[in-house]
Amino acid sequence: VVAEITDPPTSQRGPIGEIRAVLGERLQPSLVVEMAIASHDLPHEWPAEVLRDAAQVESAVTAAEREGRTDIRQLPLVTIDGADARDFDDAVYAEPRRGGGWRLIVAIADVSHYVQVGNALDREAYERSTSTYFPGFVVPMLPETLSNGICSLMPKVERMCMVCDMAIDAEGNVTKSKFYDAVMLSHARLTYDKVWQAVGLNDADARHEVADVLPQLENLHALYKSMAQQRKRRGAIDFETPEVKFRLDQTGGVESMGATERNDAHKLIEECMIAANVQAALFLEKRKIPALFRAHEPPPAEKYEDLQQFLREFKLRMPPVDEVTPGDFSEVLRMVKDRPERELIQNVLLRSQSMAAYQPDNRGHFGLSLQAYAHFTSPIRRYPDLLVHRAIRYALTSRKPTDYSYTPAEMAAMAVHCSQRERRAEEAERDVDERFKCAWMEKHIGSEFDGVVTGVTSFGLFVELDESKVSGLVHISQLVNDYYHFDAVRKLLKGERTGAQFRLGDHVRIQVLRASLEDRKIDFRLVSPRTSAPAPTGSGKAYDYAAAGERYSLPKKAAATTKAPGMFGRAAKAIGRAFGRKEAEVAAPAPAPRKAAASDNPPSRAQPPAARQHAGGQHQGRRVEPSSDRRPRKDGSARRGPAPAAVPPAPKKHGGRKPKPKGKP
């Protein structure tokens, strides 16, 4: 249920509240998304004034809007996205230059043309700050008439865009760039898999299907190879982490799941987006315009110390924290590329990173090994990108400081707000993913799978399954025939009688013992250690993860229930407590399990990153800023202090000035 607390708890009793909505008789997979939206207090209903503003937006580009813009409709720009994507932020085009090198055009949806500073659309977009993506469902930052309509770079229709036009030399370095407003027309809506089949695998059917834009795709692929080499030379960290995706049935239940791997088409787009983001950051920094930058700091000293201790178990070394560079991480990844512990070591390296965040000043990006970085390429789904567009347009169209809508102080407050909203969305996404994993495992209780030990604690082993990447606990009570002692220094469990050892990176076979959708816990039973590790390569298994019955708005309830204003405020916190926002205890998987308090076996601070991040049966590690600038990958979260008022700073008033026309903030 969704309940609103009317009386807070006291020392004698718990809180008292009123039920505002009934989600279902029991927690089912189909309710997981709705519960996450409520418990994380995600705005998902549009205020009337927002819908009114959205309805006033033109559904097609007009002749008046084309005036003053560069016409690039004849260029064969294409969009390359996932098969289930609906909001197309970016389109790309590349051509060889005389004398060598390339011209790369990255065209980004001109959301700032339609969302004016301070109007209802803008205020709601700022409050949300980001779109939140769940399997088969999205809570968008902008109404669908914009996010899936006039702002989306759909094929064969004119769209307004902001362009980053770059010259790139044969070594993959951007030698010059410029920004300008344009009107474009996407010549094809392509998917990563189709592009990879055509230019990577040279599949005849795929090449025939994309024949109209095949020369353009081959140009992009050739350019990507140069940019990838440049990325390697500068030492950017390249984490190859599979993404777990779910296929849902018509009722919202989990039909199948598995891990997907990136191909060159994903990386091609990533490099194009990164290049445009860098140029946006350099453009704004040079002109000293208040804007948001994307900052990623070097690893925190404490986490780096844990990492070094972990690596010593695998005979690996890294320099001191004050000397470490992104290239040092890349070198370790290269060294373990063919080792059976590759994925474990890579995951621990990744979780040792600091969190990326928005900042009002440029601090560089450690993970990408870049001196300047901003988010420019996804204004449909990220508010900071919209702010960057406004800053660039101000620089292109005005020389008067009074024409700019934001002060440095306002931008600093917005950086905190947007970072907090990003963490909230990530927590909600992770919550749903973990519950869907539990729902999938509920169907496989008794089944056996291969996995690797990713955490060792005093109370058992955490094991990640090879194919699905699901993690669960082998409680120490399931390690039979001996009494095991935990070695906190070497991070292993050792049998008192047999001397048998379990340590990080061990390959084991487990049986699914129990899975709880309510508390997001999965328990395994150890079947046997494996004598050999799997080859450190991709599974090669193909999945179709386009969600069945795609939903882009919450389903309406059959029985209407009166909802009080603000029901997703205090009620959200109650639901969060009821459904495990905090880590619940780990229960010993015995026939009659005794639930222990969460503090019975707290993960020690001396444990390696892998162990701490799996404590409680969940991956809680912080993720490095993804190399991709597409839909964000999941990473960790942290509270970053009190949020400022969830309203964007109002545009400054300058006695008697008329409002700026659209697109001229």
What do the PLM-derived regions correspond to, one by one?
Residues 1-105, 112-157, 189, 194-197, ...:
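Charge-lined substrate channels and their catalytic hotspots, especially those that engage the 3′ end
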Residues 1-12, 17-21, 159-170, 279, ...:
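Flexible glycine-rich surface loops and low-complexity tracts that mediate binding to linear polymers
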Residues 4-6, 72-79, 83-99, 220-234, ...:
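Phosphate-interacting basic helix/loop segments used at nucleotide- and nucleic-acid interfaces
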Residues 15, 29-40, 101, 384, ...:
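Single-stranded RNA-binding regions, centering on S1/OB-family and related RNA-binding modules
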Residues 20, 34-37, 120-125, 263, ...:
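Short secondary-structure boundary/capping segments
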Residues 111-113, 122, 183, 263, ...:
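Short, surface-exposed beta-strand-loop junctions and turns on beta-sheet-rich folds
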Residues 144-183:
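Catalytic nucleotidyl-transfer cores of nucleotide-processing enzymes
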Residues 158, 167, 179, 192-466, ...:
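Append "with occasional cross-activation on large, charged helical scaffolds in nucleic-acid assemblies
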